[in-house]
Amino acid sequence: MVEKKSAKRNRREEILQALAQMLESSDGSQRITTAKLAANVGVSEAALYRHFPSKTKMFDSLIEFIEDSLITRINLILKDEKETMPRLRLITQLILGFGELNPGLTRILTGHALMFEQDRLQGRINQLFERIELQIRQVMRERKMREGEGFATDEALLATQLLAFCEGLLSRFVRSEFRYRPTVDFDARWPLMAAQLI
């Protein structure tokens, strides 16, 4: 019984990895059909549906992985780092680094891969970015309490600016077919971004 559950979980992971790899390849710039995905995994479409009731559920699982990865790591940053600007830098690096390491998932983050899918999926990505923006805003608001001085500009505006910076570099990464990595020149870019915040 345990072996059967483990095999099912492994097949589910194999399907999700294949979908992420297809999103990373040139196939990712087009609608990915279950027929193409099944052929890529080496199973029938019926076998796909034994593991996932729909392609939407496959995307849901990938989005859940993205959410868990980013939110868990942001929480670790907040636990380990107490100063505001290093926190913001680490969160920014995390988002850009995650995108760079997971090009197929970056197509989901930018909404590119979801153009052909249910609107609800784009709503989940929107909610994820809203959660991250809320975390960034909270980090900025805590600055006055932790360090004795706040920001000169409204934290909501600054949080939006920082997230737009991340989204812009991720979009460029996708648009360039993953040639322009979002973390390249980060050490030179961050002081420019930080200067806008302070």
Swiss-Prot record:
It is found in: Cytoplasm, Nucleoid. Residues 33-52 bind DNA. One of its GO terms (molecular function) is DNA-binding transcription factor activity. InterPro entries: DNA-bd_HTH_TetR-type_CS, Homeodomain-like_sf, HTH-type_TetR-like_transc_reg, HTH_TetR, NO_SlmA, SlmA-like_C. Keywords: Cell cycle, Cell division, Coiled coil, Cytoplasm, DNA-binding. Disulfide bonds: none annotated. One of its GO terms (biological process) is cell division. PROSITE patterns: HTH_TETR_1 (PS01081), HTH_TETR_2 (PS50977). It holds the Pfam family TetR_N. Residues 119-144 form a coiled coil. SUPFAM superfamilies: Homeodomain-like (SSF46689). Residues 9-70 form the HTH tetR-type domain. GO terms for cellular component: bacterial nucleoid; cytoplasm. Belongs to the nucleoid occlusion factor SlmA family. Homodimer. Interacts with FtsZ. Required for nucleoid occlusion (NO) phenomenon, which prevents Z-ring formation and cell division over the nucleoid. Acts as a DNA-associated cell division inhibitor that binds simultaneously chromosomal DNA and FtsZ, and disrupts the assembly of FtsZ polymers. SlmA-DNA-binding sequences (SBS) are dispersed on non-Ter regions of the chromosome, preventing FtsZ polymerization at these regions. This is Nucleoid occlusion factor SlmA.
